[in-house]
């Protein structure tokens, strides 16, 4: 099977090798930089079209920062609303953690990269607190570091568009 997203991630050099500390705190010999790669419209639109076509949702949400451009692109491709989950509460203006209306909506959370699943779990918790109905997370790349299991314990299915093992093969 041809995976256009995988091909574009490779083309736009989404994998770098070296010594890295991941958001989870884990050490890694490689870094998957989807945030930079999706600045290319060809890749971003391919991801958006795939998610819009393949998944059933009423609202797409992303955790700041990596999930925001993805959520906006999917929103445009699917012609459905999007929401943004703040990484932290603001101390000015409105103090809401979520920008957008998710209450009573079937929400799909999108992530750029998952490893342990901590960011996704946080996003799911915030969405549920706001009254969203959520049972799935889509990630562009899953590093296969426990996110699937962590989310399953929360009743959430993880849907990777690409797995790290495919990207590194």
Curated annotation (Swiss-Prot):
Under InterPro entries, the record lists: OPRT (IPR023031), Or_phspho_trans_dom (IPR004467), PRibTrfase_dom (IPR000836), PRTase-like (IPR029057)
- Can you tell me which residues bind orotate? 115, 143
- GO-annotated biological processes: 'de novo' UMP biosynthetic process; pyrimidine nucleobase biosynthetic process
What Gene3D superfamilies does the entry give? 3.40.50.2020
Sorted alphabetically, the keyword list is: Glycosyltransferase, Magnesium, Pyrimidine biosynthesis, Transferase
Which reaction is recorded as catalysed by this protein? orotidine 5'-phosphate + diphosphate = orotate + 5-phospho-alpha-D-ribose 1-diphosphate
Which molecular-function annotations from GO does this UniProt entry contain?
magnesium ion binding; orotate phosphoribosyltransferase activity
Instruction: Respond yes or no to whether keyword rRNA-binding is given for this record.
Output: no
Required co-factors: Mg(2+)
In terms of HAMAP family, this protein maps to: PyrE
Cited function: Catalyzes the transfer of a ribosyl phosphate group from 5-phosphoribose 1-diphosphate to orotate, leading to the formation of orotidine monophosphate (OMP).
Subunit field text: Homodimer.
Family to which this protein belongs: Belongs to the purine/pyrimidine phosphoribosyltransferase family. PyrE subfamily.
Q: Can you name this protein?
A: Orotate phosphoribosyltransferase
Q: What is the lineage of its organism?
A: Archaea, Methanobacteriati, Methanobacteriota, Stenosarchaea group, Methanomicrobia
């Amino acid at each position: 099977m041809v995976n256009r997203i995988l091909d574009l991630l490779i083309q736009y050099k989404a994998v770098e090798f070296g010594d890295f500390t991941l958001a989870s705190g884990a050490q890694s010999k490689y870094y998957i930089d989807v945030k930079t790669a999706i600045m290319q419209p060809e890749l971003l639109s391919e991801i958006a079209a795939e998610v819009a076509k393949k998944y059933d949702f009423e609202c797409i949400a992303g955790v700041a920062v990596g999930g925001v451009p993805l959520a906006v692109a999917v929103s445009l491709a699917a012609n459905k609303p999007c929401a943004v989950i703040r990484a932290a509460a603001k101390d000015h203006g409105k103090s809401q953690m979520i920008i957008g209306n998710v209450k009573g909506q079937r929400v799909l959370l999108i992530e750029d990269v998952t490893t342990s699943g901590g960011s996704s779990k946080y996003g799911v918790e915030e969405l549920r607190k706001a009254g969203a109905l959520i049972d799935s997370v889509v990630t562009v790349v899953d590093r296969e570091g426990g996110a699937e299991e962590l989310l399953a314990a929360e009743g959430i299915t993880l849907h990777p568009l690409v797995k790290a093992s495919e990207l590194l093969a």
